[in-house]
Each structure stands twice: as C-alpha cells, then as structure tokens.
C-alpha cells in the first residue's frame, strides 16, 4: 500500500528534494545514485505529474544536480569525520526522507534523524529506523532532543536545505548549543539562511 501525501502540507516539502534525487539518479547515474529515493517515489501516493512535467527542463535538471552535489559533499564530510571518530553520533537535522546517514554507516556509528513530528511519522512508515538508528520527532529549536543523542564518541551534524526556514539568530544559538554535546563536534551545513 502506498503512503498518501497531501498537497499543501508540511509533508509535501519532502517531495521536492526526494524527487530531485530520483531525477538526478536517472539522468546522471554515473555521477549520483540514490536507490532509496527511486524506491520511495514508487511507494508514495502523490500526484507527481507536475514534477515530472517540469523535471526535464534546464532549471530543474540543474536543481537536481545541485541537490545531488550537496548530498555527495555532505556524505564525504560525514565519512571523513567518521574515519577519526568511528563511534560518533551522525545527526541529520531536518532529515525528511534523506538516507545520507545510512549511506555513511561505518558499522559502529549511531545515526539520528531529526525532523518535525509529522515528517518523522512519514519517515517511520517509509524509512523505519535501522540498527543503531533513531528517528526523533522534534523542533530543532527546542534542544530537549539533545538528551537523546549519545555523543560520547563525537558528533557530526549535517543539514541540507534546512536553514532556509530559520532566522540567523536561531542558527547562531543552535550552533553554540551543539558545542556542549561533545568536545569532538563537526558541522556540515548548507548555511544559506532564508530569514534575517
């Protein structure tokens, strides 16, 4: 049975990056491959007709490449961090339906996927947490979720396209608080902030 995502919901925001990763996987398989995105598109009940119609245009092709390059860059940084901190916490902020944490799994790290409760509800249906993985429903600005993170082996935070929705001061406050989790913290963020 397919998972229904309605138009004009927070859950609908999952579609754009997921579809971009699928399109890039199809158009440029030697550059980028996201089997999870390809599979998930088939498991979601959503009207993709407009996305499909637009997906072959130059701007959409460029956008899908941009998403893929961003994901590859973040994955490279996470894997590099794990070389020196193999038992670290890998924390995907605003995870949506992204599987970057899993693709970086070294067999001993702990993976935490954080997003709003309604997004985590979708994720739990389509991408249930695996071994050493936890899907945490939360508001990133409410740092009570820190208590659920085991950062004793270090922590690498990554966020892709999340901070467009944050004020500059909110990002500054979060980064300052993250430093309290572990002395060995790394941030891999796309920091184009949407609101001042």
Task: Pin down the residues of each PLM region.
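Rossmann-like AdoMet
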Residues: 1-91, 95-138, 151-152
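Active-site flanking residues adjacent to catalytic metal/cofactor-binding acidic residues
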Residues: 114, 159-160, 189
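A short, conserved alpha-helix within the catalytic core of class I
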Residues: 135-137, 144-146, 165-183
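Short, catalytically relevant binding-site loops at active-site mouths
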Residues: 140-143, 163-165, 193-196
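A short acidic, Gly/Pro-enriched loop at the edge of an enzyme's catalytic core
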Residues: 146-157
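Conserved beta-strand signature within the Rossmann-like core of class I S-adenosyl-L-methionine
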Residues: 156, 175-195
């Amino acid at each position: 049975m397919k998972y229904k995502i309605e138009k004009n919901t927070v859950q609908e925001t999952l579609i754009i990056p997921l579809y971009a990763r699928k399109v890039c996987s199809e158009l440029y398989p030697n550059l980028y491959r996201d089997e999870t995105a390809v599979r998930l598109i088939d498991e979601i009940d959503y009207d993709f007709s407009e996305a499909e119609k637009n997906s072959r245009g130059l701007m959409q092709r460029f956008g899908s490449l941009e998403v893929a390059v961003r994901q590859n860059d973040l994955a490279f940084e996470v894997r590099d961090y794990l070389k020196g901190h193999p038992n670290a916490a890998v924390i995907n902020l605003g995870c949506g339906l992204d599987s970057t944490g899993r693709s970086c799994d070294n067999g001993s790290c702990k993976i935490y996927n954080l997003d709003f409760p309604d997004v985590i509800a979708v994720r739990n249906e389509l991408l249930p947490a695996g071994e050493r993985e936890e899907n945490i429903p939360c508001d990133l600005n409410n740092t009570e979720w820190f208590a659920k993170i085991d950062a004793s082996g270090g922590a690498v935070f990554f966020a892709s396209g999340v901070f467009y929705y944050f004020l500059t001061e909110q990002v500054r406050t979060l980064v300052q608080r993250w430093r309290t989790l572990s002395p060995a913290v790394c941030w891999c963020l796309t920091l184009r902030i949407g609101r001042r």
